[in-house]
Regions:
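Conserved small/polar residues in nucleotide/adenosyl-binding loops
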Residues: 149-151
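Conserved residues in the N-terminal Rossmann fold of short-chain dehydrogenase/reductase
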Residues: 47, 69, 109
Length: 151
């Protein structure tokens, strides 16, 4: 296995504008904290949770952060949020199995159609890099949630 230095990875973000869908979730926040240690130009956080955005902005207090209220199911909103972005991390998803079991169509709208919207917005804006954060549970789906992330 080839070993890649941390500085080489960090250099990928130098002077870049990064957008994170689901940026106020656990993975989004961890990614934001890591990116703030680089020379990233700006980080845009796209999420539906206004309270988490306010808490995150207050706790991190970094001028490179920009917060966008939005939903991956809203393609026109993605088109606006993705303007001027170099790199996208797609971490937005419904992830709690019982919620999706009782609300399968919402799961489809967010996890499947929302992901397609992210791809469409990336293509529309010629985003140079798009990274989808997934889970190992998608390999052998056993329920509605796992079937949705398997697609």
């Amino acid at each position: 296995m080839t070993k890649i230095s941390k500085s080489k990875i960090d250099n990928q973000f130098t002077n870049k504008t990064v957008l994170i869908t689901g940026g106020t979730g656990s993975l989004g926040q961890a990614l934001t904290n890591r990116l703030l240690k680089t020379k990233v130009k700006a980080i845009r956080i796209l999420s539906r949770n206004e309270n988490k955005q306010v808490e995150m902005a207050s706790s991190l207090n970094d001028d490179r952060l920009r917060f966008f209220i939005g939903d991956v199911r809203d393609l026109p909103r993605l088109y606006r949020a993705f303007q001027g972005v170099d790199i996208v991390f797609h971490a937005a998803a419904l992830k709690h199995v019982p919620v999706i079991e009782y609300n399968p169509f919402e799961g489809i709208k967010t996890n499947v159609m929302g992901s397609q919207n992210v791809i469409d917005a990336c293509l529309y804006h010629n985003i140079s890099k798009a990274i989808c954060i997934g889970t190992d549970k998608a390999v052998s789906p056993l329920n509605t949630y796992l079937s949705l992330i398997h697609i």
